[in-house]
Regions:
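Beta-strand elements of well-folded, non-transmembrane domains
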Residues: 5-7, 15-19, 25-33, 42-57, ...
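Solvent-exposed beta-strand/loop surfaces of large extracellular or lumenal domains
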Residues: 81-110
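Conserved small/polar residues in nucleotide/adenosyl-binding loops
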Residues: 139-146
C-alpha cells in the first residue's frame, strides 16, 4: 500500500471592495462600413488584464470590448443591410482597498452595469459604460500536509 501526501493551502479573505468607473469615448465608423441609419443592438464584455497591489491600492488594468449591430445604407445603393461594428476601450484604475494587501493574492471581477451606444451622426458613435470592479484580497495562512 502506498501513502500519498499532498499539501493543502489555506487562504482567508482579507479585504474586498467595490468601485464603479465610467468609460466614455467616441469612435468613427470605418470607411469600409456603411453609414449608420439605425442602431439595432449593442452588447459588450469587460475583462481585467492585470491587478497590481501597492500597499492599500490596487491598480486594475483591463478593457471593454463592444459590438453593435446597425442598419447601414451605402450612398451608391438604395438597399439597407445589417452591419456589425466592434471596438474596444482600455482602462487603468486605482482602487482603494480596506487594508494593506502587499504580498497577498488579489483578484478582480469586473462587470458591466450599463452600456449605451448612440449615433452622433452617420459616421460617428458615442460609447458610454458603467463598469463595476470588485477587487478581493486573500492572505495565505499555511500549508497542511495530509
Amino acid at each position: 500500500m502506498r501513502l500519498r501526501t499532498e499539501n493543502i493551502h489555506e487562504y482567508r479573505l482579507k479585504c474586498n471592495t467595490v468601485a464603479q468607473i465610467t468609460l466614455d469615448d467616441d469612435f468613427n465608423v470605418p470607411d469600409t462600413k456603411d453609414d449608420i441609419e439605425l442602431i439595432v443592438k449593442e452588447w459588450g464584455n469587460v475583462q481585467t488584464d492585470s491587478v497590481k497591489v501597492n500597499k492599500d491600492k490596487a491598480a486594475v488594468d483591463g478593457e471593454l470590448k463592444f459590438s453593435l449591430l446597425y442598419i447601414g445604407a451605402s450612398s451608391d445603393s438604395e438597399r439597407m443591410q445589417p452591419v456589425k461594428m466592434t471596438g474596444k476601450m482600455s482602462f487603468s484604475e486605482n482602487v482603494n482597498l480596506s487594508g494593506d494587501c502587499t504580498g497577498d493574492y488579489v483578484t478582480c471581477q469586473a462587470s458591466i452595469e450599463d452600456l449605451s451606444i448612440k449615433a452622433i451622426n452617420s459616421r460617428k458613435i458615442s460609447v458610454k459604460a458603467i463598469v463595476t470592479l470588485k477587487p478581493v484580497s486573500y492572505t495565505h495562512l499555511r500549508a497542511h500536509e495530509t
